[in-house]
């Protein structure tokens, strides 16, 4: 018989840098989860993705054990890294914050495909292109 899930916690943490300080400690502590065990396991799973923010979904079971799934970095983070900018434009309709090539767009779409609700690279590219345009990042051929 499967264990009963009592809580689902979603956090976005720096890869390889989870520690018991907020937001991790309070989020897990209120459900009675071993915080250090989570931090060690998360850091070991994400150490190869240093520099990225990695979203994580933690399932807490009734016996206070847990399991978690790491996701791919947010599209906005991948776009800003590819464009070489600190952040997107505050007014995307007026000014451009930077640009990325279609090959970079395709690479980001391939990275994000498992987490997107689409099945083909072409549709994933359209989703990522929309995110880029909202950030004021243009797509160059």
UniProtKB/Swiss-Prot annotation:
The protein, known as: Large ribosomal subunit protein uL11
This protein's encoding gene: rplK
Any Pfam family hit: Ribosomal_L11_N
Alphabetic keyword roster: Methylation, Ribonucleoprotein, Ribosomal protein, RNA-binding, rRNA-binding
Modified how: One or more lysine residues are methylated.
GO BP annotations listed: translation
Any GO CC annotation of this UniProt entry: cytosolic large ribosomal subunit
Any GO MF annotation of the entry: structural constituent of ribosome
Family: Belongs to the universal ribosomal protein uL11 family.
Transport listed as a keyword: no
Subunit structure: Part of the ribosomal stalk of the 50S ribosomal subunit. Interacts with L10 and the large rRNA to form the base of the stalk. L10 forms an elongated spine to which L12 dimers bind in a sequential fashion forming a multimeric L10(L12)X complex.
CDD domains assigned to the protein according to its UniProt record, in alphabetical order: Ribosomal_L11
Known function: Forms part of the ribosomal stalk which helps the ribosome interact with GTP-bound translation factors.
SMART domains: RL11 (SM00649)
Domain of life: Bacteria
């Amino acid at each position: 018989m499967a264990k009963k899930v009592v809580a689902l916690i979603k956090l976005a943490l720096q890869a390889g840098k989870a520690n018991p300080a907020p937001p991790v400690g309070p989020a897990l502590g209120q459900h009675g989860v071993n915080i250090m065990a989570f931090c060690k396991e998360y850091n070991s799973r994400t150490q190869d993705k240093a520099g990225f923010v990695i979203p994580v979904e933690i399932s807490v079971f009734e016996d206070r054990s847990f399991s978690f799934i790491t996701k791919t970095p947010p599209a906005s983070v991948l776009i800003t890294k590819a464009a070489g900018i600190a952040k997107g434009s505050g007014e995307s309709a007026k000014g451009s914050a930077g640009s990325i090539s279609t090959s970079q767009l395709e690479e980001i779409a391939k990275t994000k495909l498992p987490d997107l609700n689409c099945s083909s690279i072409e549709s994933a590219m359209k989703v990522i292109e929309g995110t880029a345009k909202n950030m004021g990042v243009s797509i160059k051929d």
